Amino acid sequence: MSKTQTRSKPIVLLGSAGLALLLICLCAFSTNADAASVARSLIGLEQNAGRLEPRATTSNYSYQRMIANIGGASSTAGGNQVPGVQSGAVIASPSTAGPNYFYSWVRDAALTMKVVISQGTLDRTLVQNYANAEKVHQQNAASSSSGQGEPKFNPDGSLFTGPWGRPQNDSPALRASALIAFAKRIGLTDPFVTGTLYKSDLSAGSVIKTDLEWVSHHWQDSSFDLWEEVQGAHFFTLAVQRRALVDGAKFATSMSDPGAATYYNQQAAAVKTKLQTFWDSGNGYIQAYQGVSGRSGLDCSVMLGALKGWDTTNATAAVDATEFGPASDKVLATHKKYVDSFRSLYAINNNAAAPNAVATGRYQEDVYDGNGTSQGNPWFICTLAAAEVLNTAVSVANARGSLAVTSTSLPFYRQFSSSAAAGTYASGSSQFTTLTSGMKAMANGFVNIVQSHTQSNGSMNEEFNRNTGFNQGARDLTWSYAAFVSNDLASQGKYLVV
């Protein structure tokens, strides 16, 4: 296990040397969760406090730490942490032991590039280098039995051939959506688009076309989940596959490839039908997987699937129950049950009642501790996903000018107002204000939890310990930083462009 026991430096935050000494004793030397909680309370890191500046991670700092993990890139926060890596390759973490995450996962890379492409000023060179690196990955994956479902590659771009959970068919879908958004930003007639990204002739090996063809012909295949643990059918995988096919159909039409557009639309409709089967009406939440036993099905991957699988250009899609967007009643109902499942599970949560935010992990039954198996922990990406769903739902309500409460989502909304009832509340009404304000406060609570568990320099590992709050697992996880920036955009009423 790799565990970095680094906390904030209380003496910087406090004027009292005596109190600073007390905090050092509590934070640095105690493994007692209650003591750690008291320490956080004393230095103002309770979950309902305001934004934690300047010690805690900020969006710009997270973005720069994320960039530092890309081959050939240079950031203002640590330069480049992955020297010698293939240009444009996104490395999951600089950690090479305990655990070794020094690889380029297609999924992590695509999610990272979604954040890069969504910036106000586009770093075209960085994204082109990424696209070129992924083209090499595609070519190398062609020799694998998993094809474009090959999950990860060595730092030099060569195929990772060791034992692993294969295939992971969410990966090409995420990559396709990211690069379609990039193509739209630089212009569909740009030579890089027409030469590298999309050619209607599949034999030409263009990056987007290769992925869309793979997704459209293999979405029904059994696949490993995004956690790389279980094989079957997964909500997250299907959600992002459908998004890629919807994006791909529109893009193919624009690229004068009507036959492909028709086929992608047909397959997207079939995926949408399959997604409906994940709703568990008996338990009142979206199941994360099918064909997997021993789990409740409440899983962070559903939150991520809602965020990465909806059409961000269409606010109506965000509330449509059949679309499973982040503002839909079924996703919000699942959000409540997912968050509640961790309230008493982790000691650092102190069994806080709703509507308080708490640290969340992947799923209740998790035993991966960041390097081996013992007990699962809160993850930064999951706690941030819980925040981003709320921030996105509020943004959608503001954009639409109303908020709809159904019998399905009523328990979710009653966290914020005991008088909430099924119906539609117009923007400006007292109930609209009460509900959206409560959601924003809860979202800020999740972010404050994340910020209170970052290290003193603002860096984030993959996990933080369920009892002590210390960071552990892979250090400087690229996805953790991408998740922080993604949620920050949502909190400003912006969405990722992909």
Placement of each model-derived feature along the sequence:
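Fungal secretory targeting signals
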Residues: 1-48
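CBM-like carbohydrate-recognition segments
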Residues: 143-144, 149-154, 369-382, 408-498
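Extended ligand-binding clefts on enzyme/binding-domain cores
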Residues: 106, 139-170, 235-242, 254, ...
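Glycine-rich, acidic and aromatic/proline-enriched surface loops and short helix-turn segments
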Residues: 68-82, 136-140, 178-185, 210-221, ...
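Acidic/His metal-coordination segments adjacent to aromatic residues that form catalytic metal sites
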Residues: 91-98, 150-166, 216-233, 279-290, ...
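Low-complexity, Ser/Thr/Pro/Gly-enriched N-terminal "stalk/linker" regions
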Residues: 36-104, 128-129, 133, 137-150, ...
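Structural helix-adjacent loops and short alpha-helical linkers that scaffold large soluble proteins
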Residues: 50-60, 117-131, 182-209, 249-272, ...
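Aromatic-rich carbohydrate-recognition surfaces in CAZymes
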Residues: 100-218, 238, 484
